[in-house]
């Protein structure tokens, strides 16, 4: 999980400081903000001469950046597709739950995967049909190319068929939109969700570090470091 990645960084920091110098450019998944921050902090204690930058441009851009070598490490919050593996390698560094979030005023506390599928494809359009108050459901999601969107749509089986009212370019923007609208529902990285919105359970299982680890929470995906196959080890 993201917390495990942080612990790994702290462990690495306990080793003797090295003598490397230079810059490492990372970019991609906005959901990996907390993970890359924790790893960067730990790495800085081991190799203080290396500067690590992070550009939150989305998973698709992270994979592209690693492919065309504009990034040293691309960050993807989804597994690599077969046609993307020709030029780059993917290394899983953490697992993350995709939390289903609603406004804090919502009466809905649990949804099934089937209900989510019907809601996001427009078959269910009113909250009263899933135990909430009478009101039109407002679907908030991520933009095409987002790893979070890809993970959610693949697991819920709604690939390219969602009826989004809003398609936003960052995890934080989705959370803010759901916070501001009592009728909204969206999805976001567990590592990014705070107390401004409510997380619903999925088929009775909460989205947490423990349920992601043991696999009981169904809507989860990997966090992946993407590196170019042709880059020499000294360059990476």
PLM features: what roles do these ranges have?
Residues 2-236:
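Exported/periplasmic ABC-transporter solute-binding proteins
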